[in-house]
Amino acid sequence: MSSEEFKGLPIKRDISSTIYADRPPALSAPPCVGATGNDKIQVLPIPKKSRTIKTDKPRPFLCHICTRGFVRQEHLKRHQRAHTNEKPFLCVFCGRCFARRDLVLRHQHKLHSALVSKESINSKDKTEIDAINDKNIIQIQGNKQTILPTPSNPLAKTAVQLKKAAKEKKNGKQGKLDLSPSYGANNHSTDVSPSVGNSSTPAVIEETDSSSHFPLPDTNIPTKSKRHASFSASSAFTYSSDNFQKLHQQAKSDFDELQESIPHQVGFSTPQLTAQQLIENAIESGVVDLETLDLPPFLSLDGLPPASSSAAVAASEQIDICPSSATDTISGANSTPNQAATAPPFQLPIARESSSLFLANTPYLSDFLTMGSSYGGSGGFAKSITADPSLDYFNYKNHSHPDSRHNNSSSGINYSNNKNNNESIEKSQNNSNVINETIDHTDIHAHHADAHDDSFIESEEWLSKFIMDSQIDNDLKLNINHFNDIGFNNLHPQNPTTHSEPRNMHNENRDMHRSASKFQSVSENISPREQMSLFKTKQNKAISKFLSDEKIPSTASPSSSASPVQFDKKNVDINEFLLDESVSNLFTTRQIDLFKKNVNLYSPLFQNQKDAVSSTSLTPSLTTQTATTQSGPGWTDSSQKLTFFTEQLRNLIIKENNLKSNLFPTVDELNHYVDLYQVEFHKYFPFIHLYSIIPSSENYPLVISISMIGALYGFHSTHALLLSKIARTRVRMFLENTRSNHDKTPIWLMQSLVLLTFTSIFSNDMNAFRTVNTQIMILVQLIKISKLNYPLENFIKPPIESDHVLEYQDNPAVLNQFKAQYNTREQINRNFKYFILAQSRIRICHIVLLISNLFKSLVDFDCCFHSIDLKCGVPCYNEVLFFCENSRTWNENLTRFNIVLDSKFSLIEVSNGESNYEKCLMYLSNGNPYLYKNAKISFKTLLSLLISIHEKINIERDALKDSYESDFHAKNVQWRMHSRPLVATMLKHWELLYIKNGGILALSDENLPIINTNPSFRLIIPLYFFAKLRKCLDIAPTLRCIWNQDWNSMNSSLEKVCYERESLREATEYAVSVITFWIDTVSVMKGKSTQTPIFTITCIFVSILVIAGYMRRLEDFAQNKNSDCMIGSLKSTDRILWLKAFKTLKRIESHLSEREYKLQTFAEFLRVPDNGSLDIESLDSSLIENTLNSHDVTNQALDIITRTRLSSRTLYCGARILGDTPVWPVSLLFAHALQSRAIYNINHRKSVNSV
């Protein structure tokens, strides 16, 4: 066998030649563990795993007892103490002895945190820290005792003996108490019987576990104590008593004696070690590498880090994030003062400034090695076993924007630990109305957690910002004559040519130009005193400070917010931006057409349709519920009718908000809006369990918000504006009244804020858009403060007993009684409520993750809820479980899916979606198939993962923006070399998981019906192509200008985006796929294009801009080619892509031409004649295809590219697509942007006739 073949084989050590030959002569032999009477050294055998050399690194320092080699001499010295049992470091407070200095520091900061000086925490000098710590440590060379006398414990009593003495002193048996030390000079302990029972003990006992009663060894026979089998067998700290090392000093020490330390009724295949021995052996054997593990600082051999270090800051921010589900073993009735030392780390009364905060929520290293239970939670683990480096891909803290400095201020916020914790949680559940009745506190109780004084850090600031933004649109103006008109609320000004100054988010001090309109304000119809209750807020110091720092410009009527924007006249002809009502009329005509269809569909009892859509009559009452529902694999709608509004509730809303009855929708209209919400919106974003809502005087902002969304789908945007104002005002007042109690914010309030955020993001009102950043920020803060992003089992015990199979396996009758309890109506009802509550919490977090990161992707505002902050589960795989209207239907579906709830763990698993989102992120980063080898993931979870990829794009863009702010080319190179491959890898991992779970990416005639019946597909596919588009181009600056209605900046930004041709070509491929997906889906839906979700509409708008930019580059190239023969020929990829876009646009024009209403012409859209352009509808597709598919580019092909003007045609088709789905007001803003861009292209292009 050659030498090459020997590579990688384990090398066996010749023991006989290395025991003495390799021993350094300078090493003196310390006493051996196995010393006998004749002082002959007994060499212990080398463990089997230690015989193999695992590294080529030289290890010159050898142990003369076991021949182990070490790289450093201090490692050898530490190892030798394992043989000699030397404990030279003494704790001055209690006398406990330790083998290492850092173990003493850990012990003191854990058990004597109140006695340790705080100077070491505040000091930055390492030498000063060491000097302070040395004051509390006594070093005694050669000591082998476990405990020595100290001033506080002069007799060197162990904790068990002290407990025994305290108990007998209480019972009046002081005379019989032996006051001798624990161990005499002959190293034998005195005969003291163990203490039994749960009696109270004095507060002087600080160290031992009150539940662990260690009997002392007999005076003559060195026996070992036994631990009860009910104690945890996974923690190495409970394997033996304090005098474990005495075994090594017995002449007849062998394996049988070592087994005596093992608790009875628990068997182990190998002898158990103490925590110190376990940690040392693991490190020395190479099983654990402390450098690669993300361990807490207290396990470091170099001592604790200073308080100013990053490790100390990181540890202080992670206080109380560990679940407290393992704390139910400590009850208030049987608690003793000794439990301060025996409680889990997260229950210790730790001061925040103390160095012992490193121990809070930090699992023991021994638990890490033994799969211990320090983590707690469901199944023993509620957080990752290790800090997986894959999650670093989503670490946003290093690249955060300045406005995100408050996003994590509540990471250390905790629940209040008081005696009324159960009642407060029940009250929160009642307020949320997620469940119909209070969950019985005897079955579901809250687990206690620690409270800190700084629970609401800087909460006043973000709350005041939200209140301040609420005043922006205080003067709500409605046109009474057009209150019930169909269409957007800003299409009826009497002076449509009025224009407003463009306002940027960074130039908010610029005054708006007020339009001269004759709108009548709602505030004019009520008294000044009544106006205060709806539109004014109580001023405080924080609000006054904000108002003084930044003046809020007064707002005009809603018509001015969406009016055409006026620009500076420098180098720009202002007439090209004077957009008339041609685009607005397109939307109004389409809305009236759709409303007429809805009249025939929803209510045959409607009166004259002409009166319903006229500008002077009121909309008739709607009396019939929506009858059509759509069902599919991911969507199931119940037939139960939802009636949230009654006359009593409507009168209450009118009275509390000081409105007039004729300026508020009727009960039938409000309930009709709820139906529209359920049919059109809820199936795309199901984060509210509608059947659990019980409207009341407190939570009616939620049903108002629901009807607000439905009003948009009913084309009554004026109603939606009024309802949003009422809901926003009531939410703001609720937050003001509960300023000091935000940790108990009800779920219905967060759900209302989510719906309000939807309307603010996708509104064409500048004032509403300005409040989005604050609304998302307050949502994120409330989620973190109320710990909504953590699993529910951390705070509420599942209302189900365990199966007791092991306990009653020999008693089938009792076991059957337990199993029968799982199928009772009461138990099923409790399980259903717990499931709905858990899923509602999870879905709120996922929807906030969705809308906040999409908003960040569009306008580049850093106010998002980040993926790594989502510590809870995922939406359930079987969506129908969340749509069930009652517990009976829910239980039937559980049976249909073969889901059995026979323990709290099974209920927790179902409620958390059978996974957690951190595991999903790990798969997204490394693509490890083991994580999801056989698991099923819901499409809602896959949608959240896709949004996390968008978040990763945002993180990478922000990082490059900070590093290469002024160097565009360097930033582009770094993106292509580092960031883009990482994003592409994540997309590949996501694609594999999506396809494996039945997802569809390739469209065909066979799978189009499946896509249309599953709402998740209609969200996922456009966002998938949008992520690929963003991988190529950074379009966020352009979209930010559009939302600010700054058309000049928009055009300038688009010129920069379309600068690099290769990236633009690839992005255009994905943009064409988005448009093709839309035309494929709507062409088979028979005109039901109103079901196009708003996220898809946004992706369509961005795709239109990209396609138009690419077509303009080709048209400019074709013109330059005709005039300059030196320019290279047009590539075949460009010709294929142009032809693909041409066919898609022709399909769109053909589809939209079938509408029953007359649309504006192409010339009307451009506002100027486009001389020389060709009508694509009259062109022969086969002729164009033959011309462009020729081997050489002819002048005829270039002329076709130039004269078809697909750049302008694309913008025109985009405006017609937006007009075909006129639900959200932002569609009108998008259409104005497309018209502006089309006019800009015409005015900045050479005339075709001049070519």
From Swiss-Prot:
One Pfam family linked to the record: zf-C2H2
Low complexity composition bias: residue spans: 407-428, 617-634
Organism name: Saccharomyces cerevisiae (strain ATCC 204508 / S288c) (Baker's yeast)
Gene field: TDA9
Other comments on record: Present with 672 molecules/cell in log phase SD medium.
GO terms assigned for molecular function: DNA-binding transcription factor activity, RNA polymerase II-specific; RNA polymerase II cis-regulatory region sequence-specific DNA binding; sequence-specific DNA binding; zinc ion binding
Segments for region (Disordered): 160-227, 398-428, 617-636
Zn finger limits (C2H2-type): 61-83, 89-112
Domain of life assignment: Eukaryota
CDD domains (UniProt xref): fungal_TF_MHR (cd12148)
GO cellular component: chromatin; nucleus
Coiled coil: none
Phosphoserine modified-residue sites: 527, 603
Polar residues biased stretches: 183-202
Annotated keywords: DNA-binding, Metal-binding, Nucleus, Phosphoprotein, Repeat, Transcription, Transcription regulation, Zinc, Zinc-finger
Ranges of compositional bias, category Basic residues: 164-173
Entry's Gene Ontology BP terms: acetate biosynthetic process; regulation of transcription by RNA polymerase II
Name of the protein this chain belongs to: Probable transcription factor TDA9
Gene3D superfamilies reported for this sequence: Classic Zinc Finger
Family membership noted in the UniProt record: Belongs to the RSF2/TDA9 family.
Keyword Transmembrane: no
General function of this protein: DNA-binding protein that acts probably as a transcription factor.
Effect of gene knockout: Leads to cell death when overexpressing the camptothecin mimetic TOP1-T(722)A mutant.
Localization, UniProt: Nucleus
